[in-house]
Amino acid sequence: MKRLLAISSLTLLASLVLLVVSPARSLAAQDEVTVVDALADAADSEDGDHDHDHEGDDHGHDEAAGDEHGHGDGDHAATPLLSFDGGSAIWNLIIFLCVLAILSKFVWPAVLGGLQAREEKIREDLESAEKASAEAKQMLSDYQLKLDEAASQVQTMLADARRDAEANGQKIVDAAKVEAAAQRERALSDIENAKKVAMAEMAGQTSKLAMQVARSVVGRELSADDHADLIRQSMERLPSQN
């Protein structure tokens, strides 16, 4: 495509040169014919002045010459401007070949070099655009992957936090249950100890009361054995506190 474009441009330039040169050569040829005719007229005028004494004899000759000259002018006037000239065609061909050689040596390489440089620049721009597009797509893919990873990590952290909260809550509940059981055991132990103390105090008071009653009734002091029997009997008579 580039070679055809260069050849077409060179052919167009050569044709323009030929169009400029050919009319110039035709005008030069016409000017040459005009100069020859002028010289012939001048020679005829000099001959007429030189033979003025023989005007009568040469009058017919001059008229004939005038008719011939006029006929020649008519022939020149009747000559077409676009007549084929072999010499001009050869010269035009030579000029065309010379112009074509000059253009091929100096213009053609510059044109081809410019076209190649432009094509290379366009190709590099396209490659750069494709590379930038590929990099942008890769960056977008990496960014989306990072977003997905971050979302997954957040979900994992939330699940861990929920599991830890549930585990800590269960631990707190278990600890509360253990503490409540321990407090219940301590309360039961305290109640049992208080019951035992109360029973012991009650037994002591009952023994004293029984001794006083017995002393007042019997009128004598009880022995230790009697005292123990009375305590035992009193304890048996008391209702159970359990």
Curated annotation (Swiss-Prot):
Protein's membrane topology: Single-pass membrane protein
Task: Report the locations given in the UniProt record.
Answer: Cell inner membrane
Keyword Coiled coil attached: no
**Region called Disordered, residue ranges:** 43-74
Taking the first listed entry, what is the main subcellular location of this protein, grouped into a coarse class? Answer: membrane
Question: Which terms in the Gene Ontology molecular function aspect does this entry carry?
Answer: proton-transporting ATP synthase activity, rotational mechanism
- Locate the transmembrane regions by residue number: 4-24
Q: Which domain of life is it from?
A: Bacteria
Question: Among its keywords, does the record have Transmembrane?
Answer: yes
Give the compositionally biased regions (Basic and acidic residues): 49-74
Might you report a single GO cellular component term?
plasma membrane
List keywords of the entry alphabetically. ATP synthesis, Cell inner membrane, Cell membrane, CF(0), Hydrogen ion transport, Ion transport, Membrane, Transmembrane, Transmembrane helix, Transport
Q: Coiled-coil segments, which residues?
A: none
Q: Which family does it belong to?
A: Belongs to the ATPase B chain family.
State whether it acts alone or in a complex, and with which partners, per the record.
Answer: F-type ATPases have 2 components, F(1) - the catalytic core - and F(0) - the membrane proton channel. F(1) has five subunits: alpha(3), beta(3), gamma(1), delta(1), epsilon(1). F(0) has three main subunits: a(1), b(2) and c(10-14). The alpha and beta chains form an alternating ring which encloses part of the gamma chain. F(1) is attached to F(0) by a central stalk formed by the gamma and epsilon chains, while a peripheral stalk is formed by the delta and b chains.
Described function: F(1)F(0) ATP synthase produces ATP from ADP in the presence of a proton or sodium gradient. F-type ATPases consist of two structural domains, F(1) containing the extramembraneous catalytic core and F(0) containing the membrane proton channel, linked together by a central stalk and a peripheral stalk. During catalysis, ATP synthesis in the catalytic domain of F(1) is coupled via a rotary mechanism of the central stalk subunits to proton translocation.
Its protein name is ATP synthase subunit b 2
Q: Which organism is it from?
A: Rhodopirellula baltica (strain DSM 10527 / NCIMB 13988 / SH1)
Upper lineage ranks?
A: Bacteria, Pseudomonadati, Planctomycetota, Planctomycetia, Pirellulales
